[in-house]
């Protein structure tokens, strides 16, 4: 705080002058002392000037409602919500999230710097704090076929932007622990800044080498045992509760049962669709679920506020105390995290405010370029002996590498409701590259599903129990320039167009929510397991940095052994 601001604010802090806004008779949650104190909160120029007894030019009597810091999402991909960034921010604000630390690697994988510039522009000037982590692995691994490359040299100009905090999730852990030159350049560039991790199943010395590189966080923990190993290595665990990956319960139960200190834990959503946010909440849901599992309410709130602010060096966020930005949430119920009102920089968020969305450059609406495939192209020769296939795990984005004798005719794989066929097709540069593989555990029958949201290269992925439905699904996504589609037989049941880079809708969130809910219902009717989110599960099947086995445009890839399966 500079001298001029101090001279203006100090008289309000001392109570000699009335503050601009005073929220009176609040039960204030103090994240430093872990107390609930009945106090007034005084605000001037968007800054908290005092917590005590104050008078204001404007006063709001909270009549004993709880007042806590605005919630922070430690890691999310705005694109994964499927709606324009301002739509998502507006929706999540209603649930108390006032700070978003985003990794825009989806749009950068599709459109390079143009995608990053789009995200910066779309999130500028909103009634929330939106910070960016620059994508570290574009493409995710060197052999991936995506739409752009984001090198250390291309990152450097963005470091001057005050909203850029650090380096986004480092997925290519092999490049880190082997100190490969391209990765070393990026780590060196961000030497004094925070670096996010992505480290599923790294063990012992590998995890030590990863942490040695200065990587501070990880959101890929799926159980308490692995979370504990990361904490022991000095890392901050970002507990994820998204649409596809729901890891909170397993980790939080471990924290509770072992009386683990919560200081090295934060909350994130990572990839959470707008329909789930509207139904469950945002970071508020992580807090509520943790409290229900036995975490003391104030510790759960700390995991959503000050823990994250400290981790990311956001020194004026995450607490209700003098000098902190006046971002706070008013709660009717602490245990239920029932949001009554939200304030950002001392101004009440208007839930009814019309959302203004800036136009998208036209070239970002033409990103899907698929070959004209035939049923013959999709044939997959298989032996009479066991073949490698992808086994999906219900409720998780990890997979199992299994071998089985596949149903076949004339030496070619014949998909059915048990053994589906998945196809991934390069869509950025019109190369015509594609690959086919068998899948166990998705259980789709009498149709196909396809998506252009396919982490992280975002090629088009289709899965089904017959070639004709798969081909129709691919054709439909070419027609609408990206999105989700559901096919039953030879009929398009429903399509959710995502014309902005094949990732984002230009319709309002309510239209997206309604269509998505309908399509998920169709998928479960057609056999997809109840706890599998069909589109999230499919969107991760081509990401070759999450164990154990994936499919890329070059074929089946063994993530554990780091090699293609021939």
Swiss-Prot record:
Catalytic activity: adenine + H2O + H(+) = hypoxanthine + NH4(+)
Entry's EC annotation: 3.5.4.2
GO MF annotation: an example: adenine deaminase activity
Keyword annotations: Hydrolase, Manganese
HAMAP family (UniProt xref): Adenine_deamin
Alphabetized Pfam families for the sequence: Adenine_deam_C, Amidohydro_1
PANTHER family membership: ADENINE DEAMINASE, N-ACETYLGLUCOSAMINE-6-PHOSPHATE DEACETYLASE
Broad EC category: hydrolase
InterPro entries: Adenine_deam (IPR006679), Adenine_deam_C (IPR026912), Amidohydro-rel (IPR006680), Metal-dep_hydrolase_composite (IPR011059), Metal_Hydrolase (IPR032466)
Superkingdom of the organism of origin: Bacteria
The protein, known as: Adenine deaminase
Protein family: Belongs to the metallo-dependent hydrolases superfamily. Adenine deaminase family.
Cofactor requirements of the protein: Mn(2+)
């Amino acid at each position: 705080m500079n001298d001029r601001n101090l001279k203006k604010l100090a008289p309000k802090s001392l109570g000699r002058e009335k503050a601009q806004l005073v929220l009176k008779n609040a039960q204030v949650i103090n994240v430093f002392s872990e107390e609930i104190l009945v106090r007034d909160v005084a605000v001037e120029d968007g800054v908290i000037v005092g917590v005590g007894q104050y008078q204001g030019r404007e006063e709001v009597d909270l009549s004993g409602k709880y007042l806590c810091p605005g919630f922070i999402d430690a890691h999310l991909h705005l694109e994964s919500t499927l709606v324009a960034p301002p739509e998502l921010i507006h929706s999540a604000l209603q649930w108390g999230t006032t700070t978003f630390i985003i990794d825009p690697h989806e749009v950068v994988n599709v459109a390079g710097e143009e995608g990053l510039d789009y995200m910066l522009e779309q999130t500028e000037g909103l009634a929330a704090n939106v910070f960016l982590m620059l994508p570290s692995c574009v493409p995710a691994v060197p052999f991936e076929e995506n739409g752009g490359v984001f090198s250390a040299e291309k990152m450097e100009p963005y470091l001057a932007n005050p909203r850029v905090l650090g380096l986004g999730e480092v997925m290519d852990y092999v490049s880190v622990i082997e100190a490969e030159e391209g990765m070393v350049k990026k780590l060196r560039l961000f030497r004094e800044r925070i670096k996010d991790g992505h480290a599923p199943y790294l063990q012992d010395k590998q995890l030590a080498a990863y942490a040695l590189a200065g990587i501070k966080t990880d959101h890929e923990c799926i159980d308490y045992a692995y979370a504990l190993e990361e904490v022991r290595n000095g890392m901050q665990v970002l507990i994820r509760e998204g649409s596809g990956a729901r890891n909170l319960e397993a980790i939080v139960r471990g924290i509770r049962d072992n009386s683990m200190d919560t200081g090295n834990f934060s909350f994130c959503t990572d990839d959470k669709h707008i329909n789930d946010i509207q139904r469950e909440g945002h970071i508020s849901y992580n807090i509520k679920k943790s409290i229900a599992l036995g975490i003391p309410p104030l510790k759960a709130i700390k995991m959503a506020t000050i823990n994250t602010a400290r981790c990311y060096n956001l020194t004026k966020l995450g607490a209700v105390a003098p000098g902190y930005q006046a971002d706070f949430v008013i709660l009717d119920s602490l245990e239920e995290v029932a949001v009554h009102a939200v304030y950002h920089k001392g101004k009440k968020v208007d839930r009814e405010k019309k959302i203004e969305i800036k136009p998208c450059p036209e070239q970002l609406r033409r990103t899907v370029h698929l070959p004209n495939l035939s049923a013959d192209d999709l044939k997959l020769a298989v032996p009479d002996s066991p073949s490698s296939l992808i086994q999906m795990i219900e409720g998780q984005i990890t997979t199992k590498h299994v071998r089985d004798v596949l149903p076949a005719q004339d030496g070619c794989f014949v998909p059915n409701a048990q053994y589906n066929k998945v196809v991934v097709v390069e869509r950025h540069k019109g190369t015509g590259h594609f690959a086919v593989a068998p899948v166990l555990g998705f259980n789709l029958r009498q149709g196909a599903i396809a998506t252009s949201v396919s982490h992280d290269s975002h090629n088009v992925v289709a899965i089904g129990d017959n070639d004709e439905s798969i081909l129709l699904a691919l054709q439909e996504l070419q027609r609408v320039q990206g999105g989700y589609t559901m096919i039953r037989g030879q009929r398009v049941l429903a399509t959710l167009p995502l014309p902005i880079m094949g990732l984002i809708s230009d319709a309002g969130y309510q239209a997206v929510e309604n269509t998505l809910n309908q399509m998920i219902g169709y998928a479960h009717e057609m056999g997809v397991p109840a706890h599998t989110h069909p589109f999230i599960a499919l969107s991760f099947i081509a990401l070759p940095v999450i164990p154990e086995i994936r499919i890329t445009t070059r074929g089946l890839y063994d993530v554990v052994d780091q090699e293609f399966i021939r």
